[in-house]
Amino acid sequence: MPNITLLKRMLVFLLLNNYFINHFNCVKCKNLNTLCIHNTNLRKTVEVKRKEATKNQIKKEVNKSDKLNVQCSPPQNIYLSDRSEDKYYLNKNKNEIHIIHFGNGLHEKYENLPIENNNYNEIIISKYNTKNKENTEKDLYTKHINKRCYLNGNPINFKILTSLYKWINSKKLHKHIKSKSAKVDKQSPPYMSIYINYGFTKPKLLFINYLSTKYKNNGKNKYLKKYLRKYEELYEKYTYELDEQNDTDVISQNNREPMPNYSIDDFLIQNKNKNYKVTLVYDYISNLHNNEYQNVESVNNFIKNNELFDINEWKKNNKPYLIYKYKYKYKNPINKQIHFYEYDYYVPKLITYEEDISTEPKFVSPNLNSTKCYNNSPINFLTTSGFSSRNIDTFGKERNKIYSFNTPTDVKRNIYFNDLIKISSSYNQHFFHNLNFLLNLYTLQILIRDKTAIETDYIIDKFDQLKDKLIQLNTHNSLKHNNNNTKPSSQKYEERSSQDSGSFINSYYKTDQATPQNADYHYEDVNSPQTFVNFEDNIKLNGKISSDENLKKKENTKNEINDNYDNELDREISRHLTHKKNLFDDKIQIFKNKYNENILEDTDFIKLWKYDQNGEIIEALNQVPVPKIYLNIDAPKYCLWKILQNSGKNAYSEIPTPNRKLEAWRQQVNLKFFYKQNFDTSISLRNISKEELSNFKMKIVESTNQNEKHHSDQYTQINCQEHGKDNTQHDDKNNPNFRNYLNDKKTHKKNAESNILQTDKITYNVSTDEKRETQYDVKGNNPDTETNNEQSTVNKLKEKHKKAFYTLVVRDGIIDEILSDDISILKKLNQELKEKNESNEGKGNDLDATEQRENEQVGPNGEKKTTSKIFVGSFFNIKDPEVEYLINKELYFIPEHTNWYKKNTQPFVRGQIGKQSRKFDNDYPIYDYRKSDFGMAKFSALNLASIKDCAVLYLDKDIDLSDKFFHIIFISTSKNEDENLQNDQSYVVYENIPTDKQSPNLEKKQPSDEIYNEDEDHETSDNLLQNDQATNSNVEINHQDDKGNEPNSITNNIQKNNNYKKNEITNSIHNPITNPRLVLYIKENSKINIHESHISLNNNNGGMVNALSRIYLEQNSKVNHILSQELGKSAWYFHNVSVQNGINSNYKFVDILLGSLSSRVNLQIEGSQGSKQQSYGLSLLEGKQNISQYEMFHHEHSSMQTDQLFKSLVSDTAHSVWRSRGRIERNAIKAKLNTLCRSVLLNLGASAVAIPTLEIIPSDIEEANHGATISDLEEEPIFSLMSRGIDTNIARRIMMKAFVNEILEHVPDENLKNKVYQKIFKFSQKYKDESKKILRMTNL
């Protein structure tokens, strides 16, 4: 082989190598400057130089042509392709390698050219240096016309092209071009009009690309569609198009490579911890508007120290961001004037998808080091912490939009991962709305974090060590206190003065504490060391004690100082556990070292408030007054780490996660909207009076008058009129009792008002009392417009009504002792029960001795313990050790999680449940994956994690309270209820977008095209403040210093250069999450009635109520449990009711569901031998409500009986779901199980789903039935009523009342019944027009 051919082939081989091309690029084409390179990798570095070279060459040619005034020939060394960046070189030198690439159909296109003799071959190549010239011409035409040709010869003969150019510029061709072809681009060179006008494929000169795969350009982003994964199929639809092709090349190159399984720590190590300093900030900022302990002046300083991103860098990159503006009023407790404060902070805005695209299940590889993250999903690093690395499955293309613990609003992977790391999990409530219920919103954020489980376990261990240390201190102090009773007073004082720490179990909210005062009624700082020094100096100067009276006074003052000091230490401990939230991540080592030291020595957060004897704040460092009940939140007994010493901290390790076969959540059609809610902790801090709860408290008809009430109800059902008034009220118009009622009306009002002012110190409007009284009418009418007899009948009914024996009010998950009834009622009842017990046992001779002996029992450490027969109140007020142990054991019960570890409850995954599983009795599951009806384990875990308090009702054995009702009211408030926050500037979120770009997912509620300027916002806010000042007489505007406005000045300077559009997203919308919990423990042979109510005082309230009720019955006990739900129309309600029924016990459950946007009640009953359980439910739906109820009755033992009935009235476009599951195990012989659901659809838009199931294993059962019906109102009864002269509207109302009365028979509360009837009246009024249309059609 000759050397020339060898050199040529070696040259081709070297050029095919990327490394050689890179070296070739480095030497800037000095030796091979005539090569035409078409390589994406090389274009990234050479593109700028090519553009400059081509522009210079074109300018030179244009200048020459302008000077000569002659049409120049096209440059012989440049060809332009269809894209601006594809510019290629051709050299004038001969004997070099040249590349020419024409599109398909070249022969046909050149035949149409006006060239003499059709000499198109000369256009392609003029000369050839090969031996057989004729053969090469034939091969060129026959074989290589549709391929990329690589030839070695002379350059193209441009003489023919110039002749063509001159001919094209003629008049005839210009007319031909204008009529048939497109216009020529002005920027393109003249000779390119040949390709443009005749539709030729422009030359795409690809260098040494003959052996590679062909490239097909689809006209769009070529690499995205080819290389994006399935979960990024919506990339082009929901993202802006990239301008430069280089960016798409980078993206496609990253997407081709699979993402490695590395944790956050690995990522941060690779990036040298640059981004780690601004990561994982707690939700402290988002809760500033509702924080009780934050000083107003330090807000701006906190924002500066915890900025999530640099605004300068963010705006240089033209990225969108959010502005959170808060403005609230607070009353200064010293001068009694109203002050204003407004602040804002900035949060980066990430681009998210609108639809759920997580179609593939996420799994964790076995070799993954971190237990807090998932494969190929960097977003899960921040959202799924706190739970184990179990396989989290989704439902598929459609079902995953319903229930998925991953990210339905999925953030783009790889590209924005650096920005994603900068976001704290607390801000996921603004970006990743589907995982709000997994986030810890209160003190347990230390446990559910974005780090590994090692640090979490370390913190829990430190909690345990701290508790042991405090217990030792407590026992040591208690022993000293007992020894001091036998020591002289001087020795007592010396020992007390040497103590540096206090008791841990002192009750925090004893408001009757005495504190030292000065003559001017100003309190001294009991924690300052000067008070101790001065006190000791006085003792040393006096020497001996003059008299016993002075000694007692000094001892009392010193005891008060020590008690207050102990309380301050307790507060300081709680603040170390809950307040220093910003020291967990970026300063984790300092946080750990803090626990290694003696925590009692640090006194940074001791000074909080100073109180008077009534518990009112007279001086506060934070200058924000808080109601007395909310002062208990950070008390030592309210710290959650005390609860987590048992199984509570293990509840997060192996919680079962529902998989794609879960059937219960399929019917929950509106959960996708739930994922997009912005939940927070913005509860209301306003004062709530007892008068506001009068319409929600129980009104029970006495047993002697039940028959009269029953007859009156029957009479009202028949004699109804269209306007909703009862005929029975017209018969008593001349009743003389009404005159007496009118005469005594004013006196009753004054007496009631004075009593409330004396007892509760709360003023209210008399008109509100009248409105509350008027709501006893069944039809919801106003008695003021009625006649005299109507007022008298209402007055009579009032006299017959009685209230609940005791009402316990729980406000936002915390027991409110002010709104609850007086605790002396329970103490009196407890004493009566003890006396009755003593009399029954024959030990009632000396009641004083027995009372003292039982109420005061000395423990092993010398502390006093008390026993109780009944307890109703907060879990943290329990003093009986037996009660605390029993309640504490049930406090950590989580449905599904606790049952998961039962015997024979492992999931069965070998096939369909039924055929194969019955071959293996030991492996038969109870709560298996495939038929798990609830899927509420994570909601229950969140309830335990975010618990602040727990309502407890304990009843000792052999106590019959079946004639008494205990009413427990759970109130969920919202920041929207506050009167001082009803302006538009209280809580506003703005989205700032660069003017040259648009956000892909912009949800504009109130769009504005104005350019954002913060100065204008401050001016408008100042105007609003001035307007508020005019309305409030004693209002003082508190303007901040220049230091507090430094962040605003920085952003103003930035926004002068970069213009952003401001779009308002939310305005004064607060959606708080509350987690109420109720524990009932009824011992053997006891009976009780419980009414549990969940209410909202404002019907417009939203948010989420995540409740859990645990009920435990011992043998031969009986419980009647009534549950009512009357939340706001925008609230989300999730409630787990878990019941353990004892041997031969009877549990009756009645639930009435009226309010909320979406409600979900899960009832799980575990029975015992001979137990009986009953369930009666009623739901009334209107609008777009979605109410669902899931019930599980588990028969594990013999002779169990279950009766279930659920009814629902569905109106408008509401949706009702009912799912029942009854399971009878092999040993549960002689069982009785009956379930039935009846749903009535009132119009065409309503819908309902009913799924009853029975799982029966034994053959020896007495009875098992299940059924469900979904229908409209029956027409025949309505027609029979209409034939008797009753209007259609009233006839439908009578039918609906008859439908619900079967459930209301089990409800003794008249207020609740009236609300059901009022809603039925609304249903009947909606069909007034439809009935007339039907009559018109019949008449025609």
Curated annotation (Swiss-Prot):
Primary location: plastid
An example molecular function term from Gene Ontology annotations: metal ion binding
GO cellular component term, pick one: apicoplast
Comp. bias intervals (Low complexity): 477-487
Pfam families: SUFBD_core (PF01458)
Composition skew (Polar residues), residue ranges: 782-794, 1022-1037
Inactivation phenotype: Repeated attempts to isolate gene deletion mutant failed, suggesting an essential role of the gene during asexual blood stage growth.
Basic and acidic residues: compositionally biased ranges: 723-734
Region (Disordered): 477-498, 723-743, 765-794, 835-865, 992-1055
Pathway this chain belongs to: Cofactor biosynthesis; iron-sulfur cluster biosynthesis
Biological process according to GO: iron-sulfur cluster assembly
Keywords: 4Fe-4S, Apicoplast, Iron, Iron-sulfur, Metal-binding, Plastid
Nucleotide-binding as UniProt keyword: no
InterPro entries hit by this protein: Fe-S_cluster_assembly_SufBD, SUF_FeS_clus_asmbl_SufBD_core, SUF_FeS_clus_asmbl_SufBD_sf
Localization annotation: Plastid, Apicoplast
Coiled-coil positions: none
Subunit structure: Component of a complex composed of SufB, SufC and SufD in a stoichiometric ratio of 1:2:1. Interacts with SufB. Interacts with SufC; the interaction enhances the ATPase activity of SufC.
The family this protein is said to belong to: Belongs to the iron-sulfur cluster assembly SufBD family.
Stated role: Participates in the sulfur mobilization (SUF) pathway for iron-sulfur (Fe-S) cluster biogenesis. As part of a complex consisting of SufB-SufC(2)-SufD, involved in assembly of [4Fe-4S] clusters. Enhances the ATPase activity of SufC.
The name this protein goes by in its record: Iron-sulfur cluster assembly protein SufD
Classification of source organism: Eukaryota, Sar, Alveolata, Apicomplexa, Aconoidasida
